[in-house]
């Protein structure tokens, strides 16, 4: 798990996508793009994010569907709703929630 001063968001924060209708809780951070080139090229060129920025791993939800998402910092906004994220893996990674943030389970 990574933490750094150059990431705008932190592990445990609930965020929403700037352009698409989904939200999620951050469970890991890559400080620059760290996925496959095939995945990157599958994003339409006109909306493809820069690689030289943090990318976040999310336990995401959209309507009644849950999944894991990999999203660039430029496409995220803080979710201020304080509503819990309803993802089946939340309890495996986080031990609780206070306000709008989740807390990691200590190893």
Positions of PLM-derived features:
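Short, solvent-exposed secondary-structure boundary/capping segments
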Residues: 33-42
